[in-house]
């Protein structure tokens, strides 16, 4: 009996990951059977865990917190997106035994905004809240969509300035944000503790979309605040999660899943 193609997601913690359910839905669309497992790698043991997985026949892996930067250094070669982001969320085994690193987070975000939410990015003004790895990972792909302006706001200005200089965008301290933005994207993790970024409510007055990169309950504080402050449309990061997974699946298997039915399936779970 032929073994099924094996895929995985590495993280710590990783028990909460919805990636196995998402990728099984993609496999149903393709009409194939796959295995997809969660692997909780020890801090300090990520490289060995990845090596063991691929040496025993692994066909592809996703990488989540806190290993995306380590995965970048582990990969033997990188896509342009991964190089720009300085982080890897997708590992692809090559025929020569090496690993290629890619970053599909930005594709997941922009496909959700433009294809599922039907909001154009080109010519729009975008505010990014936060300056961590999640935000850094999506800036290169956002820029490809040619927005009129990208502003990054962070609690500590130095970190925002660092990303602004790296990517040729603007930076402001969180408390000094003013003016209207078409799209406001929250990349801070405060929602996990019920907190919202320290921003004035009037910045949402002309906001076509307020988007939180996390999904579920963790997105609720920010999205409620945005809605009450005048944002026309709000969305959590479930579509981004499914979108980045679909891009990874396509890199591994050469099959591009339709993300819309999978987003609806995950909402119903």
Curated annotation (Swiss-Prot):
Q: Which domain of life is it from?
A: Bacteria
Q: Where does NADP(+) bind?
A: 80, 130-134, 154-159, 213, 237
Enzymatic class? oxidoreductase
Q: Which reaction does it catalyse?
A: shikimate + NADP(+) = 3-dehydroshikimate + NADPH + H(+)
Give any Gene Ontology cellular component.
Answer: cytosol
UniProtKB keywords: Amino-acid biosynthesis, Aromatic amino acid biosynthesis, NADP, Oxidoreductase
An example of a Gene Ontology BP annotation on this entry? shikimate metabolic process
EC number annotated for this UniProt entry: 1.1.1.25
An MF annotation (GO) of this entry: NADP binding
Entry's InterPro entries?
A: Aminoacid_DH-like_N_sf, NAD(P)-bd_dom_sf, SDH_C, Shikimate_DH, Shikimate_DH-bd_N, Shikimate_DH_fam, Shikm_DH/Glu-tRNA_Rdtase
Q: Binding positions for shikimate?
A: 17-19, 64, 89, 105, 215
Give the residues annotated as coiled coil: none
Task: Give the residues annotated as active site.
Answer: 68
Pathway assignment reads: Metabolic intermediate biosynthesis; chorismate biosynthesis; chorismate from D-erythrose 4-phosphate and phosphoenolpyruvate: step 4/7
Q: What NCBIfam families does this protein's entry cite?
A: aroE, PRK00258.1-2
Q: Tell me the function of this protein.
A: Involved in the biosynthesis of the chorismate, which leads to the biosynthesis of aromatic amino acids. Catalyzes the reversible NADPH linked reduction of 3-dehydroshikimate (DHSA) to yield shikimate (SA).
Please report which protein family the annotation says this sequence is part of.
Belongs to the shikimate dehydrogenase family.
Under HAMAP family, the record lists: Shikimate_DH_AroE
Subunit arrangement? Homodimer.
Q: What is the protein's given name?
A: Shikimate dehydrogenase (NADP(+))
């Amino acid at each position: 009996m032929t073994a099924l193609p094996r895929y995985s997601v590495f993280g710590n913690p990783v028990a909460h990951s919805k990636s196995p359910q998402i990728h099984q839905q993609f496999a149903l669309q393709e009409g194939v059977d796959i295995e997809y497992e969660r692997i909780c790698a020890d801090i300090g043991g990520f490289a060995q865990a990845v090596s063991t997985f691929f040496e025993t026949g692994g066909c592809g892996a996703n990488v989540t917190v806190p290993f995306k930067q380590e995965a970048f250094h582990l990969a033997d070669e990188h896509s342009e997106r991964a190089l720009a982001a300085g982080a890897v969320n997708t590992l692809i085994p090559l025929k020569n035994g090496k690993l290629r690193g890619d970053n599909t987070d930005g594709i997941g975000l922009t496909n959700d905004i433009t294809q599922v939410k039907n909001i154009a990015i080109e010519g729009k003004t975008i505010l990014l809240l936060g300056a961590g790895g999640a935000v850094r990972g999506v800036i290169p792909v956002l820029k490809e969509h040619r927005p009129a302006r990208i502003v990054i706001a962070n609690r500590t200005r130095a970190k925002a300035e660092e990303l602004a200089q790296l990517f040729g965008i603007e930076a402001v301290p969180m408390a000094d944000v003013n003016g209207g933005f078409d799209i406001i994207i929250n990349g801070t993790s405060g929602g996990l503790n019920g907190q919202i970024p320290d921003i004035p409510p009037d910045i949402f007055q002309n906001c076509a979309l307020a988007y939180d990169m996390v999904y579920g309950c963790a997105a609720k504080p920010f999205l409620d605040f945005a809605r009450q402050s005048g944002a026309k449309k709000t969305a959590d990061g479930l579509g981004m999660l499914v979108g980045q997974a679909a891009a990874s699946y396509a890199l591994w298997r050469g099959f591009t899943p339709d993300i819309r039915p999978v987003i609806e399936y995950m909402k119903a779970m």
